[in-house]
Amino acid sequence: MSIEEILEKSGAILEGHFILSSGNHSEKYVQCARLFENPTYGEMVGNMLAKKIKKYNPDLIIGPAMGGIHIAYVTAKYLNKRNIFTERENGKMTLRRGFKIIPGEKVAIIEDVITTGKSVKEVIEIVEKMGGKICCIASIINRADENPFKYPYEYLTKIEIPIYKEDECPLCKKNIPPEKPGSRYLKK
């Protein structure tokens, strides 16, 4: 089964009016958490991503909460590598729970969907500060126009969905109320 078929069967692509984690607006939202409602789909996608990044030979797989936690874990499982995650504390991405990055360790950063790459860039900063060596970045879905990182970037599929600044959003102009599904909007 292809990644596109899995996304469709899992109901991961939502339609409506959404405010993305970046603050931009969109008519569609990819909710990759829906993939993991069915463990078979989650395992399939993690295996696909593991095959994509195996050539980088990472020592550690790290994903930002919330979206990157599941896919980073399943990818690490297939590569038999250590897995940790970052999370927000008072609005700032941090490494907690006793997680460590060993200086010199080759690190793969895994995310579910990348649009602007903002969360991943915050993880990059943490990894670099702790002396990790980033070998690659990977995601299930690429919504970016180009690679927004200075590191190799692998993904399973590219989905082009128009995004709008708030003042240019046609859905706002129609007074359609937006939803905020991204983890950046979870109550702190």
UniProtKB/Swiss-Prot annotation:
Q: What is its EC number?
A: 2.4.2.10
Q: Name one GO biological process term.
A: pyrimidine nucleobase biosynthetic process
Which residues of this UniProt protein bind orotate? 115, 143
Query: Which cofactors does this protein require?
Result: Mg(2+)
- Identify the domain of life: Bacteria
**Single Gene Ontology MF annotation:** magnesium ion binding
Pathway noted in the entry = Pyrimidine metabolism; UMP biosynthesis via de novo pathway; UMP from orotate: step 1/2
Q: Where does 5-phospho-alpha-D-ribose 1-diphosphate bind?
A: 111-119
- Record-linked InterPro entries: OPRT, Orotate_PRibTrfase_bac, PRibTrfase_dom, PRTase-like
Among HAMAP family, the record links this protein to:
PyrE
Task: Spell out the family assignment given in the record's similarity comment.
Answer: Belongs to the purine/pyrimidine phosphoribosyltransferase family. PyrE subfamily.
What is the name listed in the Swiss-Prot or TrEMBL entry for this protein? Answer: Orotate phosphoribosyltransferase
Which organism's genome codes for this protein? Thermosipho melanesiensis (strain DSM 12029 / CIP 104789 / BI429)
Gene of this entry: pyrE
